[in-house]
């Protein structure tokens, strides 16, 4: 029997010319994962048949996070209905939802002993509600098995979903609602063509309208071709939507078919973005070359909560 051809992870990118991949500077390099903690986390996830964005998106921090028993669960399968030019998650026609997945996620959270758990997903434009009810069921399952754990969701934009999708997630009461803007609006046609900048911004604003006490969070990548003024404008837009927490990290090109790295932003520039963001009123800022949405999310949540209490004069 002839060998089957390898699965093409990004068929929508196959026609694109290869983009040069510049050499990473020293401040981007990370060690390969080898610790026992990493292996234990991997085994728990495998045994529960769970996907993680850590693996699917090729996160550079996977070794550090998994060594500490931290992982970001990716629900609703490994296949995304979008084809963003920066993302390494597989694109194609997804499978049906697994109704037992919320329970398996909750079991893994309990087994890992997570005090703070991050749940994300692929985009599911094929579902009427974009997977909102599946998010809600997962939140409730975790609450049932690990009532002391705090829960952060990193959701898609529900752009093509029926009315009520966002409400379903918010009503399940995650502690943090995260939705990433990813980049400046001028780069959306090439970086995030299936999304709409102002729709995503409005989504974040609506979360606060639905539940003013819920923490909101959003992230952007730099090094895609934006300029400093564009980043500062995104910060202003986020603050106008009452976003509490911003993450800023360096874009890293997964393959030659993905969007090219325009440049590597220096650690000093990240410090400048951090200072600017705090000056604009964010309660929490994470801005480093290796910052990702869920990197150190548990520690960051504790600081975020403390910052709100201090602002309210209750520290």
From Swiss-Prot:
> Which positions fall inside the Radical SAM core domain?
66-283
Claim: rRNA processing is one of the keywords in the record: no
UniProt-annotated location(s) = Cytoplasm
Q: How is the cofactor bound?
A: Binds 2 [4Fe-4S] clusters per subunit. One cluster is coordinated with 3 cysteines and an exchangeable S-adenosyl-L-methionine.
Q: Name one GO cellular component term.
A: cytoplasm
UniProt-listed Pfam families: LIAS_N (PF16881), Radical_SAM (PF04055)
Tell me its cofactors. Answer: [4Fe-4S] cluster
Is the keyword Iron assigned to this protein?
yes
InterPro entries the record matches: Aldolase_TIM, Elp3/MiaA/NifB-like_rSAM, LIAS_N, Lipoyl_synth, rSAM
The protein's Enzyme Commission number: 2.8.1.8
Q: Which key words are in the record?
A: 4Fe-4S, Cytoplasm, Iron, Iron-sulfur, Metal-binding, S-adenosyl-L-methionine, Transferase
Catalyzed reaction equations? [[Fe-S] cluster scaffold protein carrying a second [4Fe-4S](2+) cluster] + N(6)-octanoyl-L-lysyl-[protein] + 2 oxidized [2Fe-2S]-[ferredoxin] + 2 S-adenosyl-L-methionine + 4 H(+) = [[Fe-S] cluster scaffold protein] + N(6)-[(R)-dihydrolipoyl]-L-lysyl-[protein] + 4 Fe(3+) + 2 hydrogen sulfide + 2 5'-deoxyadenosine + 2 L-methionine + 2 reduced [2Fe-2S]-[ferredoxin]
Q: What residue spans carry the Basic and acidic residues bias annotation? A: 9-29
Pathway given in the UniProt record: Protein modification; protein lipoylation via endogenous pathway; protein N(6)-(lipoyl)lysine from octanoyl-[acyl-carrier-protein]: step 2/2
The enzyme's main class, written as a single word, is: transferase
Binding-site residues, [4Fe-4S] cluster 2: 80, 84, 87
Question: NCBIfam families from the entry?
Answer: lipA (TIGR00510), PRK05481.1 (NF004019), PRK12928.1 (NF009544)
> Could you tell me what this protein is called?
Lipoyl synthase
- Native source species: Paracoccus denitrificans (strain Pd 1222)
């Amino acid at each position: 029997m002839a060998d089957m051809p390898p699965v093409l992870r990004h068929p929508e990118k196959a026609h694109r010319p290869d983009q040069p991949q510049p050499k990473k500077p020293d401040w981007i390099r990370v060690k390969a994962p080898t610790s026992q903690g990493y292996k234990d986390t991997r085994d728990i996830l495998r045994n529960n048949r769970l996907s993680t964005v850590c693996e699917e998106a090729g996160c550079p921090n996977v070794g550090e996070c998994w060594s500490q028993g931290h992982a970001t669960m990716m629900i609703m399968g490994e296949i995304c209905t979008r084809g963003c030019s920066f993302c390494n998650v597989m694109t194609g026609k997804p499978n049906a939802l697994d109704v037992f997945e919320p329970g398996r996620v909750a079991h893994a959270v309990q087994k890992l002993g997570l005090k703070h758990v991050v749940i994300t997903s692929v985009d599911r434009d094929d579902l009427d509600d974009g997977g909102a009810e599946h998010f809600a069921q997962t939140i409730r399952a975790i609450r049932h098995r690990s009532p002391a754990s705090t829960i952060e969701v990193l959701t898609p934009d529900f752009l093509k979903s029926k009315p009520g999708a966002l409400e379903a997630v918010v009503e399940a009461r995650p502690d943090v609602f995260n939705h990433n803007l990813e980049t400046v609006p001028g780069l959306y046609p090439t970086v995030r063509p299936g999304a709409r900048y102002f729709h995503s911004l409005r989504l974040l604003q609506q979360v606060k309208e639905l539940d003013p006490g819920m923490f909101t969070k959003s992230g952007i990548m730099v090094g895609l071709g934006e300029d400093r003024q564009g980043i500062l404008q995104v910060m202003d837009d986020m603050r106008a939507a009452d976003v509490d927490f911003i993450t800023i990290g360096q874009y890293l090109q997964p393959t030659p078919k993905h969007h090219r790295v325009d440049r590597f932003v220096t650690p000093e520039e990240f410090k400048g973005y951090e200072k600017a963001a705090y000056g604009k009123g964010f309660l929490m800022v994470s801005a480093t070359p290796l910052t990702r949405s869920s990197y150190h999310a548990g520690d960051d949540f504790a600081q975020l909560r403390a910052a709100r209490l201090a602002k309210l004069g209750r520290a």
